[in-house]
């Protein structure tokens, strides 16, 4: 009985350590993903700003011939 209890306590301690390590990993990944989202947003904005659209606005469009 005593050996079983010691084994369970050992497993619990190992699981607690593993959970803490996984938590740290998940937190680090979340921070990295936030940085990557910010970089992607900035790059998207820069790309849109550097490449003007070839589609004219409705004000610039000439009306179709049937008008």
Swiss-Prot record:
Pfam families: SlyX. Residues 47-67 are annotated as: Disordered. Residues 50-60 have a biased composition (Polar residues). Belongs to the SlyX family. This is Protein SlyX. It comes from Salmonella paratyphi A (strain ATCC 9150 / SARB42). The gene is slyX.
């Amino acid at each position: 009985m005593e050996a079983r209890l010691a084994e369970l306590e050992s497993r619990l301690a190992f699981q607690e350590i593993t959970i803490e390590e996984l938590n740290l990993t998940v937190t680090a990944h979340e921070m990295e993903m936030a940085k990557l989202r910010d970089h992607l947003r900035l790059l998207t904005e820069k790309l849109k700003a550097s490449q003007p659209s070839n589609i004219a606005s409705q004000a610039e469009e000439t009306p179709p011939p049937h008008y």
